[in-house]
């Protein structure tokens, strides 16, 4: 997948105008950069040194900071040079052109791949780094930091080691059948240990996709009849004018989306077409999409017009819906109103009535979905879930009365799946899938 004998380089910061740009070099010949840029100063490891950088014709390119991290005490485990220069597009281009004369441009994720191959991180920690880079909210960053710290790796390594210990006892029987397997108490211990792992993995999988939801965002859909104030509420929560607000019913036809942050939780908010009877084929398509998105959503905010409150009739009441009386401009207080057994929150965007309470309700619902800062490690990717599910299936097939070879194979396959999550395998396509999603320079 990659030639780790090559010395690689890349821009680690975003290309564009900025105060500082960081260029990273990693490999056995990283120190060649000093000669190439005519740097004469002594570079002390892990100290910032101010230097002038010159091109081949001895023209000054820029002055900046150079830091040398000798192997193995670096991000990649190799010799690493970091150049901190002015964030000028021209300067960056010139330096990258100069480096390309002696080194190879890194592929996306190649620095992290080398860190993994050199034992600096396991796969879940590497994925945590990617999640931290992509994090847009406090809770996303918090989850990523936990993963980088090795939460998942420690959990899965512990389970895997327990399986290996069990398998070693069973393998011993193959060589010495007259010893271990004759003890009934030993059989019971092995069976109890396997069943304990089955319960732990089942509980781990039965987490309502909390980790994945936090990575991807909680899907919230605003629904209701036409002209009930959906777009006004959408713009208010998004804190910008995205949807067209009009007195004419049926203005919103397609689904509009906004990524917002409520209480540190990532929310994907959708404004949808008003639900009503219509003969307009375009509006009907919008209504169809609205119903589909509402069905798929993690949470719904259903709006009813305040002036029609005596006639409200909701056939299905569920905990994943917040019921709102919109355009409640004349309400005396913002206490919930109960109609036909349903609690509805009066909200007026115009007068700021009920808006804070609505945001608090959304945050409470998000905390319920995300498991409000749980201490236990959570699955954060479908890749993890797939391997854990396969490991569980192998363990559920475990039967102490089966032939010894089948028992051993089920345990081996379960341990393999756990190892696949953290990267204790030699399956190149899995590694390619993980690291191809990184940006260049990481």
Curated annotation (Swiss-Prot):
Positions bound to (6S)-5-formyl-5,6,7,8-tetrahydrofolate: 24, 82, 120, 442
Pfam families (alphabetical): MMR_HSR1, MnmE_helical, TrmE_N
CDD domains xrefs: trmE, TrmE_N
Subcellular location per the Swiss-Prot or TrEMBL entry: Cytoplasm
Main location (coarse class): cytoplasm
Matches recorded under InterPro entries: G_TrmE, GTP-bd, GTP-bd_TrmE_N, GTPase_MnmE, MnmE_dom2, MnmE_helical, P-loop_NTPase, Small_GTP-bd
Binding, GTP: 227-232, 246-252, 271-274
A GO molecular-function annotation: metal ion binding
Residue ranges annotated for the TrmE-type G domain, each copy included: 217-367
Keywords linked to the UniProt accession: Cytoplasm, GTP-binding, Hydrolase, Magnesium, Metal-binding, Nucleotide-binding, Potassium, tRNA processing
Gene Ontology CC terms, in alphabetical order: cytoplasm
HAMAP family, sorted: GTPase_MnmE (MF_00379)
Role description: Exhibits a very high intrinsic GTPase hydrolysis rate. Involved in the addition of a carboxymethylaminomethyl (cmnm) group at the wobble position (U34) of certain tRNAs, forming tRNA-cmnm(5)s(2)U34.
This protein's name: tRNA modification GTPase MnmE
Source organism of the structure: Wolbachia sp. subsp. Drosophila simulans (strain wRi)
């Amino acid at each position: 997948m990659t030639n780790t004998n090559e010395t690689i380089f890349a821009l680690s910061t975003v290309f564009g105008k900025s105060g500082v740009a960081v260029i990273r070099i990693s490999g056995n010949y990283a120190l060649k950069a000093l000669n190439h840029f005519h740097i004469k100063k002594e570079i002390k490891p892990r100290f910032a040194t101010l230097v002038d950088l010159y091109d081949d014709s001895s023209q000054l390119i820029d002055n900046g900071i150079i830091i040398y991290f000798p192997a193995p005490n670096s991000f990649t485990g190799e010799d690493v040079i970091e150049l901190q220069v002015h964030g000028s597009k021209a300067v960056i281009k010139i330096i990258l052109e100069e480096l390309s004369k002696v080194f190879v441009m890194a592929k996306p994720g190649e620095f992290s791949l080398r860190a993994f191959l050199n034992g600096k991180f396991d796969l879940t920690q590497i994925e945590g780094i990617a999640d931290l880079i992509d994090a847009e909210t406090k809770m996303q960053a918090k989850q990523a930091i936990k993963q980088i710290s090795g939460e998942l790796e420690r959990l899965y390594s512990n389970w895997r080691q327990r399986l290996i210990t069990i398998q070693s006892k069973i393998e011993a029987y193959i060589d010495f059948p007259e010893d271990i397997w004759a003890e009934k108490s030993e059989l019971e211990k092995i069976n109890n240990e396997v069943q304990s792992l089955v319960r732990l993995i089942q509980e781990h999988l039965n987490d309502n996709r909390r980790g994945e939801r936090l990575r991807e965002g909680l899907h919230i859909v605003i629904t209701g009849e036409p002209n009930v104030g959906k777009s006004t509420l959408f713009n208010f929560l998004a804190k910008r004018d995205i949807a067209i607000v009009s007195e004419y019913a049926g203005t919103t036809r397609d689904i509009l989306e906004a990524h917002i942050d409520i209480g540190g939780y990532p929310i994907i908010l959708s404004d949808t077409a008003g639900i009503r009877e219509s003969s307009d084929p375009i509006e009907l398509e919008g209504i169809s999409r609205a119903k589909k998105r509402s069905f798929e959503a993690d949470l719904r905010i259903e709006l009813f017009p305040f002036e029609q409150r005596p006639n409200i009739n909701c056939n299905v009441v569920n905990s994943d819906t917040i019921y709102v009386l919109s355009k409640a401009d004349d309400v005396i207080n913002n206490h919930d109103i109960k109609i036909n057994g349903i609690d509805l929150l009066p909200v007026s965007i115009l007068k700021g009535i009920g808006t804070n309470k609505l945001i608090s309700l959304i945050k409470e619902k998000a905390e319920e979905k995300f498991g409000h800062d749980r201490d236990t490690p959570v699955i954060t990717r479908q890749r993890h879930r797939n391997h854990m599910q396969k490991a569980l299936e192998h363990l559920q097939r475990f039967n102490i009365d089966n032939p010894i070879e089948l028992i051993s194979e089920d345990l081996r396959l379960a341990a393999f799946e756990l190892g696949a999550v953290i990267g204790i395998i030699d399956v190149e396509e899995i590694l390619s899938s993980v690291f191809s999603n990184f940006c260049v320079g990481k």
